[in-house]
């Protein structure tokens, strides 16, 4: 719960795909229906479950696209790295 809040704060309570206007973004400053996504799924990386380098704030649409593999892992990972450097 605390980690989820921290990641949303790090990401300014905005979907990190929408803010970059990628993958069918409908609204750049999207703060609705935000979820914290594990870039590498928990079943593949239990040890990264709470690691900031594996977590990103996404809207429900982009979260679903990531889960379906429609947004490449490497691209999501690069956004996370960028966010952690701020």
Protein language model features and the residues they cover:
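Compositionally biased, intrinsically disordered low-complexity segments enriched
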Residues: 40, 64-65, 85
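Short linker/helix segments within small regulatory modules
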Residues: 40-55
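Generic alpha-helical secondary structure signal
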Residues: 2-5, 53, 74
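Short Cys/His-centered divalent metal-binding micro-motifs
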Residues: 20-25, 55-77
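Charge-dense (acidic/basic), low-complexity helical/coil segments
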Residues: 76-86
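Short cysteine/histidine-rich zinc-coordinating motifs and their immediately flanking basic loops
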Residues: 26-41, 70-76
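Short cysteine-rich loop/turn motifs with clustered Cys
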Residues: 1-35, 59-61
């Amino acid at each position: 719960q605390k980690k989820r809040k921290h990641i949303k704060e790090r990401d300014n309570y905005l979907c990190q795909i929408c803010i970059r206007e990628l993958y069918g973004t409908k609204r750049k400053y999207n703060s609705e229906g935000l979820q914290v996504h594990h870039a590498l799924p928990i079943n593949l990386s239990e040890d990264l479950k709470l690691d900031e380098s594996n977590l990103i704030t996404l809207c429900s649409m982009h979260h679903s696209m990531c889960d379906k593999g429609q947004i490449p892992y490497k691209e999501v990972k690069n956004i996370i790295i960028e966010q952690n450097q701020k």
